[in-house]
A protein has these predicted regions:
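C-terminal scaffold of the Radical SAM
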Residues: 1-3, 22-45, 49-329
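Short active-site neighborhood of thiol/selenol oxidoreductases, capturing the structured segment around
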Residues: 4-8
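Local cysteine-cluster metal-coordination motifs and their immediate loop/turn environment
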Residues: 9-22
Length: 373
């Protein structure tokens, strides 16, 4: 499988925890120039590129007006062979959803929408700097259903300061009541330079302790599994195995192109990234130049170790023969000693030809992964 990621670097406002590259309308209002430049980048992709998955992220894709969304989707169809696409996703924010935008998505082939709820707790939403509230999130979800989308993901954030265990479970219960096909349940990360990180460093925010975070994580896991959700990746749950195929491609070492400012690609043994500057990105493409700002030639063994770590994020683990066919390296030859030690410690499990994290290691996976790379 191969994938296409498209980065829309526009947000209505800046969330207090986010360090993704984006600009607000006050900083950049020439959407037409961005869309023209994005189309020029599509034209630079290999002519035989035919992705299996497409993911439009950001930023906030639904910060685009409906007409602009249609222009972007039309340019994708004009320049990229979508005949193999089985999943075409777009992110959306509750505060910028409209029936017109959803109609444009539907008409343009989008068949999966990921809505950035983050919490159904209004106090938590204010702390995160989100522009919507719980009622708006629920209304946005129902708007998606009314528009005919039958594959919907809800994003939630865990470990939000001030959230009591009962608040955390209330968020999970609300998800179970809405019954989306998929839930992404990400840990709050304090990125350098963000307002929330400054508040934490200066003592205005106190994150929950590790034990409380772990208890909440496993309580949510149990609640969702009791409601019919399969826990298929450390931070992801799905009903009826409606996994996010685009992310599965990432986790299993697949190749992909990224378009848009700051987007990254992995193709033919190289990793490359576009410049994280919207103005320079547009200037370069308008001049017929490449927006690529970074190229890394991947060492095959390093890439195999990276793929091992990503693949182990999936709860079913990996088939070691399949892993070898994908990477050209057997797991035991890459890091057999470290794997043996972690099996003895109960962090990894090996059953016949399959290697996986133990259930107890799900919340401490980073310490496991650091031993494997």
């Amino acid at each position: 499988m191969t994938g296409l990621y498209i980065h829309i670097p526009i947000c209505i406002s800046r969330c207090r925890y986010c360090d993704f590259y984006k600009m607000t309308p006050n900083e950049w209002d020439n959407v037409a120039l961005f869309l023209q430049s994005l189309e020029l980048e599509f034209q630079r992709l290999p002519k035989d590129f035919a992705p299996d998955t497409v993911f439009i992220g950001g930023g906030t894709p639904t910060a685009l007006e409906a007409a602009d969304f249609s222009i972007m989707l039309d340019s994708i169809h004009r320049h990229i062979d979508l005949s193999n696409v089985v999943e075409f996703s777009s992110e959306a924010n509750p505060g910028s959803l409209t029936p017109e935008k959803l109609a444009a998505m539907k008409e343009g082939g989008v068949n999966r929408v990921s809505i950035g709820v983050q919490s159904f707790n209004d106090k938590a939403l204010r702390l995160l700097g989100r522009t919507h509230r719980a009622r708006g999130a629920i209304e946005g979800y129902h708007m998606l259903r009314e528009a005919g989308f039958d594959n919907v993901n809800i994003d939630l954030i865990q470990s939000i300061p001030g959230m009591k265990p009962e608040d955390v479970l209330a968020d999970a219960r609300q998800v179970a009541e809405l019954r989306p096909e998929h839930l992404s349940y990400y840990n709050l990360i304090y990125e350098p330079g963000t307002p929330m990180t400054r508040d934490r460093d200066e003592g205005r925010l106190i994150p929950p302790g590790d034990d409380e975070e772990a208890d909440n994580y496993f309580a949510v896991k149990k609640l969702l599994e009791d409601e019919g959700y399969g826990h298929y990746e450390i931070s992801n749950f799905s009903r009826d195995r409606k996994h996010c195929l685009h992310n599965v491609l990432y986790w299993q070492g697949g190749e992909y192109f990224g378009c848009g400012p700051s987007a990254h690609s992995h193709w033919k043994g190289k990793r490359f990234g576009n410049i994280p500057d919207l103005k320079v990105y547009c200037d370069r493409l308008q001049k017929g130049e490449s927006p690529v700002d970074m190229i890394e030639v991947l060492d095959p063994k390093d890439k195999a170790r990276e793929t091992l770590v990503m693949w182990l994020r999936m709860t079913e683990g990996l088939d070691m023969d399949h892993f070898q066919s994908v990477t050209g390296h057997h797991v035991d030859m890459l890091c057999g000693d470290a794997i043996g030690s972690m099996i003895e410690e109960g962090l990894l499990e090996r059953l016949e030809n399959r290697l996986a994290l133990s259930s107890g290691a799900l919340f401490v996976c980073n310490s496991v992964f650091s031993e494997l790379v």
